Each structure stands twice: as structure tokens, then as C-alpha cells.
Amino acid sequence: MSQGHTGAPKAPVVSFENVRKVYGHVPAVDGLSLELRPGETVAFLGPNGAGKSTSLDMLLALRKPTSGRIRMFGSDPYHAVKAGRVGAMLQSGGLMPEVTVRELVTLVTGFHPRPLPVGVTLRRAGVASFADQRVDKLSGGQTQRVRFALAICGKSELIVLDEPTAAMDVETRRLFWNSMKEEVAAGRTLLFATHYLEEADQAADRILVINKGRLLADGTPSEIKARAGAKRISFRLDQVNEPFLLGLPALVNLEVRHDVVQIQSSDSDATLYAIIDAGYRPREIEVTSLGLEQAFLAITAEDDATNGLIAGETN
């Protein structure tokens, strides 16, 4: 938690209080409550249709919640957006064609209540090298970087990014996150939604996992991984007996490729002891914690299974 000079906690940059957004009878966001503190880098993770984009749209005052309350810097999000306190990079919306990158950034900067010098924005967004190219002639990755330039062209305190590295190649993604580190170092708060879980693992100091519009997990990358409660066991085994392996205690998942066995287990000791007690002699044994992707899948799968069971009981 961020602290002020007096040691008292700083007020949250963003707060959602039991927010719901319903389309017809279908909740896209269902009782979402969360807070973002100053200086945090927060990843927003969830499968397609989880409610990430709807939540970001409501945060940016593009949609109104059906019920609940959203606050940005202590007031309605509309006022913070109008004052230029937030910059955003969304998936939807095109860029003006037949103008250069420099011309577009200059135009948007001119409307910003708290503008940065255009040259500073071009450099920080990593678009200076193609600033004189036309926007409609850029690659997908370059276009994304221009969107980023528009998001940071002012002295915004909060930056909101929805799938920012889509269409970027590996090198462009690396350069993008280097740019983001500069923004965070300058004291900005960052909230980003992504499908690249390795980015969340490396860049975020906090991760929010949502599914069906509900918050399932909130913690550091390490805490989210531990939340899954399983470990991966990998080893080589002569004469693999799949029926035996499928009956192992604490088994969560099994993959066999030739003589290589990979197991997800909720109790790695019990699983390994059962293999050895049965007379098998596994080689090259490795026991590791699940990666963020496996933890994310386990958390959302558990939620899906629980909801499916509840739905079945009510039918």
C-alpha cells in the first residue's frame, strides 16, 4: 500500500464499489469491488467475455454502471477524464488517416488539458523514428505504439491500456514495456488488460483475475501462482502405464509424451510416493510451482466448475 509523507495511506486512484453492468438480463460485470493505489502497476486478467473491457469502459466514463459506484481520484470518472488526469489506449476506434504520426500527436496534444511537448511524447512512446510516416501506412505494431503515444501525450496520473501489445512482435513488445517502465518511474499508476500472461508476470506488481464479471483473485504474481495450490511434476519413465498414472492421488492433470511425464498435483509428495511405492523408478525428476498461465487457468476453471454445479442444482 502506498504511503504519504506522514505515513498515512494515500487515497485510492480508482475504486469500484459493488459495480454491476447488465445487458438485458445478462450481467457483464457482477458485483465488482477493487481499488488501485498510486504508483501501482496492475494487470487485469480474464478470459474472453470476462468483463475486462466493459469494466475499463465504465472506468473511463464511456459506459455507466447499472448499479454500484466508481470513483477516480475521489470523484466521478467523467471529471478526471475531462481534466486530463487519465490517458487511455483502447482496442476499439481507428486513427485518423492521411496524416503523419507527428501531425496526429500534435493535433491530439493540442486538445489535452495538461499537454506534454510533442517531442517528449514521440520519444517516450518510441515513435520518433517513424514520426514523419503516414499513419495509414504503418504496421500493426507501429499503429499500437501510436495509440500509446496518444495515451501519454499529457501529464496524466493514471494510464489505462486494453490489450496494448496486440499486433506487436516480440522486439516491439520489449521496447513497449521499456517505455512503460519510464512512465511508472515517473510516478504514474498503470492498469492494463492483456492476454500475454508472461507480460503480467514480468511487468505487474499486482494482478486482478476476473471471470464472468466477478473478481476471483487479487494479489502479487507470486500470490496468484500460490493460489492455484498445485505443483508441476516432470520426469522420465520407462514403460509408461497411463491407467496407473491416472489413478494417482492428488492428480489434477496428466500429460504423457513418449517417456516424458508431466503431472499437475495438489500434493506433490503424495503423488511421487505413490509412484515410487508402486515400484516405478522415475528419472530426471523436477518439481516446480505452476506458472502464471497454469495458475490463471486453474483459478478460472475452478470458478467455471463451481458455477456449473450451482446452475445444475438450481435447474
Which sequence ranges carry the predicted segments?
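Helix-to-loop junction immediately C-terminal to a conserved catalytic motif
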Residues: 60
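Conserved ABC transporter NBD signature motif
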Residues: 68-82
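Conserved ABC ATPase "signature" region
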Residues: 106, 110, 116-131
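Catalytic Walker B motif of ABC-type/P-loop ATPase nucleotide-binding domains
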Residues: 159-163, 168
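Helix N-cap at the start of a conserved alpha-helix in ABC-type nucleotide-binding domains
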Residues: 170-172, 195
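ABC transporter nucleotide-binding domain
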Residues: 178-266
